[in-house]
Amino acid sequence: RDRFNGDKTFTVGFDYEKYNEIDYAKALSDKIKIDNYSKLVSSEEYWAAIPKIQYHMDEPLADPAAIALYFVSQTAAKHVKVAMSGEGADEFFGGYNIYREPLDLAEFQKLPKGLRKGLANIANAIPFKFKGKSFLNRASKTVEERFIGNAFMFNEKERARILKNPTGKYDHKELTKPFYDKVADKDDVTKMQYIDINFWLIGDILLKADKMSMAHSLEVRVPFLDKEVFNVARTIPTKYKVNKSNTKYAMRQAAHRHLPDMVAEKKKLGFPVPIRIWLKDEKYYNMIKKAFTSEAAEKYFNTDEIVKYLDDHKEGKTDNSRKIWTIYMFLVWYEDFFGNGVKEPVSYTHLTLPTT
């Protein structure tokens, strides 16, 4: 705080308590004597902005937080030209809850691999879901087999079912193996961090931060990605990054020196968006269903299958929100660039050059 000369913070939230940290951000800003500017984003605003946001994204990105970043950048751009953001802290200092998984699986993975595989096969043979099924499945695999970061969405069977022209058999390990090989001598948490730094951080976190801020001509700086910060982070033992009770342990201990305890110990929330709630609303269900039965959808998808994702989610049978969102973002992007979607006006400045 002594070296930070910023005097403003920016926050957005949504009309659900679980998805709204505006009051918390304001309280913290007051505590450290910084002005806070916030915006409560309505569901109508959020959904209306999607085509324009996908236009600015240039490529289909199925991360609902990109739209939240669009609105927080819009809010910030009204007051500043340059802003600092926290991208990179989770990847460097162990902030994602999934990094605690190796600790949770440790005892089970002491069993012989054949036994673990056998238990997982038995669990998978049971046609209905039950508590512990996913645990047995993941615990039967090595970290190299089970972890590709947040990018995993559809398995091979699902792809074959929903796509009209599915790609050939593809093993994600072909993509991640060269990176896992570079950290073969490291512990599982470090391996997961390395995968996220090379895939999730580059392909999602920084991509959406750059595109959404640039949509408002806002320059975003990411101090956690300074090479000196990385050189510190890489020396921190894993036990000081994650433990069974929390994440970013070392970073939280440092935060205690400068921030209130409630901040230093706050559980990670991320940038959550109430997509799974909205998809059960009749208005947004119908909006998605229209896209899922469109001409573009018919071109690439077996529409009965993707509508089933939507129906099952609405009826509460399973949480298909990420799968639905992934397909919908592709269709919105496709309509933007190959259909009759939003087209941003382009202004041209004509220069008259002196003749020599």
How would you label these PLM feature ranges?
Residues 37, 58-62, 104-110, 239-243:
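Short, polar/flexible loop-turn hinges at active-site or ligand-entry regions and domain interfaces
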Residues 15-17, 44-45, 89-91, 98-99, ...:
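Short, solvent-exposed loop/turn segments at secondary-structure junctions
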Residues 15, 22-56, 172-175:
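A conserved beta-strand->alpha-helix junction
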Residues 2-7:
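Conserved S-adenosyl-L-methionine
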Residues 65, 78, 82-84, 134-351:
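Adenosyl-5′-phosphate
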Residues 71-130, 187, 200, 205-229:
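Active-site adenylate/phosphate-handling loop in enzymes that bind or generate adenylated species
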